[in-house]
């Protein structure tokens, strides 16, 4: 990206910081992570969780959801103005699991939001530490990306379910700021824009008046975020058209769907960060690790290191496979839901299988599930190598991909060919070049057709031994590209339901 000089790194977005040098960034990200860890330790004390219970990922998720809810100002305001039966707008809670006489029991807890906010601020030197909250949101988003398909949501907005590799971050709340915007896939942005345009079509006051002016500003901002993800001039020019439209309607929806499809080959830049469950940070802080002093990066070796030395657990349903549960969480931790499985397998040092072959449901346990039969097992989150997370889609080229997911969105900066099913992608573009964006469409289609299989993405980038923390000796793996590389291939993952 030519504009690299003017861009803030994700760590800077993550910590809300202005431009800083590498050491300052590592320190401010470390400060954020340390604050999250201190908060977790304090919550475990408040809830009287044993060491083992504090390492249970389900307890971690409940605590995370409580703090996100405590700071969700818009929802809190809404709840106070629209009191609903049996919901106290000032309280938040969830299931906490405890081991009693060798059995896991569920206990529903309720806390004052004010109290949670106090504990959070206290752990973060008295500040609101919004960056830490966003970090937790991204971890939840990465977990959703690895767990669920978005077929229904894609179909509802007129997109193709096979475009699932573009849907990173589709469950992130709008309030997730610049760091959240950086990790959203092209499909996610397109879907948000289409929903907005559809509301405008159905409600003639949507773009009018003082509210409409704010809506318009939000629309243009989202268009600019999406434009910034595209790497070719023609795609960006098309986004300018969509943004400048006086009265966005079906023509804009068409253009956006066209752009989303084009991103299967002309990939957008989507950031990837390893965001870990809060209990992992808590364990590290409790064992005396000083994140701010040591510094931390979300895109380097640090998260791999942390996972090498933390033992955390998960509840397991009777017919689930603990190894599969571990894979799900490993993928979520490294934001690798849409990465090529061959790359993930190499880095993890264990075969990573497609979603459809996993004998596991999501990590969270529904309130009506029977606890009698629940067991717990250790999550195996270690890796054989580490690799730098990427913020670009890599160069583009042709390769066979699959019936389910027809492209990948790389997570790790590792040299390889990027697979996608050229025939399938191109079939979507037949004869669709009329209208005011026709020259751009023609140009985009031409670029897609000329993308070559032998072009290697991330030239010379490789994986590193875990002892090579300065990334000095890259190992460039060779992949057997004849195999299937998509995670959501021919898939039966559950749908994501709010």
Swiss-Prot record:
Region Disordered, residue ranges: 1-21
GO molecular function, one term: RNA binding
Top-level division of the source organism's lineage: Viruses
Keywords, ordered alphabetically: Capsid protein, Helical capsid protein, Host nucleus, Host-virus interaction, Ribonucleoprotein, RNA-binding, Viral nucleoprotein, Viral penetration into host nucleus, Virion, Virus entry into host cell
Family matches, as Pfam families: Flu_NP
Subcellular location, principal: virion
Family: Belongs to the influenza viruses nucleoprotein family.
Name of the protein in question: Nucleoprotein
Lineage: Viruses, Riboviria, Orthornavirae, Negarnaviricota, Polyploviricotina
């Amino acid at each position: 990206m030519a504009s690299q000089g003017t861009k803030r790194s994700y760590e800077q977005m993550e910590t809300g910081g202005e431009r800083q040098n590498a050491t300052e960034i590592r320190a401010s990200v470390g400060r954020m992570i340390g604050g999250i860890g201190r908060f977790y330790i304090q919550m475990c004390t408040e809830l009287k969780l044993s060491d083992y219970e504090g390492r249970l990922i389900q307890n971690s998720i409940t605590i995370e959801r409580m703090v996100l809810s405590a700071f969700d100002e818009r929802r809190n305001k809404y709840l106070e103005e629209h009191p609903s039966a049996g919901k106290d707008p000032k309280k938040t809670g969830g299931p906490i699991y405890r081991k009693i006489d060798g059995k896991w029991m569920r206990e529903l807890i309720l806390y004052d939001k004010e109290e949670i906010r106090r504990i959070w601020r206290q752990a973060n030197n008295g500040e609101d530490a919004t960056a830490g909250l966003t970090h937790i949101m991204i971890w939840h988003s990465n977990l959703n990306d690895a767990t669920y398909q978005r077929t229904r949501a894609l179909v509802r907005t007129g997109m193709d379910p096979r475009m699932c590799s573009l849907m990173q971050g589709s469950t992130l709340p709008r309030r997730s700021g610049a760091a959240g915007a950086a990790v959203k896939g092209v499909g996610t942005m397109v879907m948000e824009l289409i929903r907005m345009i559809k509301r405008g079509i159905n409600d003639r006051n949507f773009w009018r008046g003082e509210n409409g002016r704010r809506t318009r500003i939000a629309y243009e901002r989202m268009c600019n975020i999406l434009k910034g993800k595209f790497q070719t001039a023609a795609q960006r020019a098309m986004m300018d058209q969509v943004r400048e439209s006086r009265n966005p309607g079906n023509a804009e929806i068409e253009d956006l769907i066209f752009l989303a499809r084009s991103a299967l080959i002309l990939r957008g830049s989507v950031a990837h960060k390893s965001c870990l469950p809060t209990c992992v940070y808590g364990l590290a802080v409790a064992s005396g690790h000083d994140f701010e002093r040591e510094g931390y990066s979300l895109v380097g070796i640090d998260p791999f290191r942390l996972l090498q030395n933390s033992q955390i657990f998960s509840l397991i349903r009777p017919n689930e496979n603990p190894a599969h549960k571990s894979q799900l969480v490993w993928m979520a931790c490294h934001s690798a839901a849409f990465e090529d499985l061959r790359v993930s397998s190499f880095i993890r040092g264990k075969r990573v299988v497609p979603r459809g072959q996993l004998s596991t449901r999501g990590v969270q346990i529904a309130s009506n599930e029977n606890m009698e039969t629940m067991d717990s097992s250790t999550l195996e989150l270690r890796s054989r190598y580490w690799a730098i997370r990427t913020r670009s889609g890599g160069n583009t080229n042709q390769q066979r991909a699959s019936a389910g997911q027809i492209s990948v969105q790389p997570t790790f900066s590792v040299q390889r060919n990027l697979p996608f099913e050229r025939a399938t992608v191109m079939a979507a573009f037949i004869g669709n070049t009329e209208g005011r964006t026709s020259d751009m469409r023609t140009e985009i289609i031409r670029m897609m057709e000329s993308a070559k299989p032998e072009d290697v993405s991330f030239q010379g980038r490789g994986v590193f031994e875990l002892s090579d923390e300065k990334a000095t000796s890259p190992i460039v793996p060779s992949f057997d590209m004849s195999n299937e590389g998509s995670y959501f291939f021919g898939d039966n993952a559950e749908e994501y339901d709010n």
